Amino acid sequence: MGVEQPLGDNIVTASLDGLVNWARKTSIWPMTFGLACCAIEMMATGAAKHDLDRFGIIFRASPRQADCIIIAGTVTKKMLPVIKTVYEQMPEPKWVIAMGACACSGGVFDTYSVVQGIDEALPVDVYVPGCPPRPEALLYGIMKLQDKIGKERNSFGSAIGLGDRLEPAA
């Protein structure tokens, strides 16, 4: 009895948000932007022992192919315009991970030439603290970003994925 299903179990029903978010969170392509010692730990995370490929994460060298940027290390005021330009070249939706104490809060460098946290210039989605953080910490941060992406609401009216995240004041 009940409604007959002519196609049987060959159809999966899901919301469009859930489907798009699943695709995005299981295929993050981060732009590598290593500025100091944290970059070594980021490279170790991509190596065989930790293997980011199993999470669908493939490092990209071009911002036009990336949907995430990992700021790893000390951000100087001279480097900040370059980071902003790279961020602007990334297609939407895009996410930012601040890796290491220097990227999160300036670290031990409380000086005029160091930006005291990349969140002064870019909207940071995940902070990975440590000096430098271990590869396991970056993996945990990436998994937190995947959780965040999975819960996002998409606006499919004008363009896919232009969320309601607040941008920092210029």
Curated annotation (Swiss-Prot):
A Pfam family annotated for this chain is Oxidored_q6
Q: How is the cofactor bound?
A: Binds 1 [4Fe-4S] cluster.
Family as reported in the entry's similarity comment:
Belongs to the complex I 20 kDa subunit family.
Q: What does this protein do?
A: NDH-1 shuttles electrons from NADH, via FMN and iron-sulfur (Fe-S) centers, to quinones in the respiratory chain. The immediate electron acceptor for the enzyme in this species is believed to be ubiquinone. Couples the redox reaction to proton translocation (for every two electrons transferred, four hydrogen ions are translocated across the cytoplasmic membrane), and thus conserves the redox energy in a proton gradient.
Task: Tell me where in or outside the cell this protein is found.
Answer: Cell inner membrane
Protein name as it appears in the record: NADH-quinone oxidoreductase subunit B
Coiled-coil features, chain-numbered ranges: none
Q: Name one GO biological process term.
A: electron transport coupled proton transport
Class of this enzyme: translocase
Report the SUPFAM superfamilies cross-referenced here.
Answer: HydA/Nqo6-like (SSF56770)
